[in-house]
């Protein structure tokens, strides 16, 4: 069975891992980095992903960041003169990760386990699956990020029984999960979170502070300047990271804008104390889901054995202190917070292929599911933190006499009124026979699969007529749209491959021209004119093809030049070897002569 890669598709950074033997290994990207910025930019028709895209974010307005925050919505982003769905942009990131994983493995990759925040709703999970499909990946499993982290942490501890709390604060989302580990079973007891809290929010607090201070000093609002804003974002992210290691950092942004008197610069010192003050409310928000998860799991703090920190934002000192204060425990630092989720996803891939044995993952649904009933009430069928996969049925009836149809309004959330919860979908069960209200028996069944994706069935028990809906993401992508996006992604991948081949060819041509010119210079006046003339002619032909920008001709002429230059190099090598041999022979003769010179004639006197 082919390898199943594990992908952590993050808000700010992503990572890909693969199982090698029994160990999960992070695959470094082409720049040698173990995580890849979740950034996509467009330039001259080319799609750029990762570090290169992030580097040009300041100067390139067609750069898209933090697309994960829009997953599961109908919101689109504009770039490159087109509109893109969040799934398409996410697919570009996935395609890039898939591409360098294939380079590393030396084989085609078609299957993946992709992680999502535990608190992602059904629409967001479906959108993630669609993104994988567009990228040419069969998504074998959607796994919650804290669960994946627990899998990576606990794989070598299957003989130990312990309860762990995973505190996962990423770039854009926050989750807390409590798991029980024992005998290879990873049982999620409860999960809670906040999909609108992450490292980006901490950056924004610094940005707002810089904008306010600059406006106070210069009377200019930098938030209205898109390029200045991107520079502020980069500076804020750097300052946040610096303050994890030092207590004060200098922010210096020369020529940030221009005033009436000329260019203006932003110079500011940010202390850790000020940063803690700015982000106090964000840190406080992390405490609520911790308490919620403990309450839902029915556990006290003393029953938690380990606290695992996941996500780059858990490096913020105030966050670490809050975790210590809230749990009364020193966090376990045995896992890399940036890499552990992708590693856990790869382990789940190994469970699916059978390479990892005796491991069972029991995850839960993060939010309650139900339907709207009379009076706009939200009636729950499946409570949050129910182990998945699961199925639940309940019988309802009509609200009016002779009602011919019922509307099934499917919702996800915790609020008592339907209007306050998230709509997952609507469908209708028709042709209900005329009867007084309360008589027809309508059975509604909810099914949640192992990926947390929901399907709902309504059945008239009198007529046996039924209607089923698989909840689609809010983006409303049809199968046809996904197929079109897949074809576009394949075409882009082919175009990228051709573009890379073209760049490689041009580099090879430049290298060959430089090397041949050097060799011709070195062989001047050393004989073998025939070989030199042939190499010079081939060099001139290649230069002409380069000038004409004819790629096919360049390829052919490059092969010809390499052949002629090699023949010349062989001659040069032979001459050098002969000269070396002659020199060695001469040296030997000289040594022999010197030995003769050292002989002293002795005098012999006979007595």
From Swiss-Prot:
Organism: Streptococcus suis (strain 05ZYH33)
Classification via NCBIfam families: PRK00290.1 (NF001413), prok_dnaK (TIGR02350)
Family the UniProt entry places it in: Belongs to the heat shock protein 70 family.
Role: Acts as a chaperone.
Short name of one Pfam family: HSP70
Signal sequence segment: none
Gene this protein is translated from: dnaK
Gene3D superfamilies attached to this UniProt entry: 1.20.1270.10, 3.30.420.40, Actin, Chain A, domain 4, Substrate Binding Domain Of DNAk, Chain A, domain 1
Modification Phosphothreonine occurs at: 173
Keywords tagged on the record: ATP-binding, Chaperone, Nucleotide-binding, Phosphoprotein, Stress response
InterPro entries, sorted: ATPase_NBD, Chaperone_DnaK, Heat_shock_70_CS, HSP70_C_sf, HSP70_peptide-bd_sf, Hsp_70_fam
Name of the featured protein: Chaperone protein DnaK
UniProt keyword Nucleotide-binding, yes or no: yes
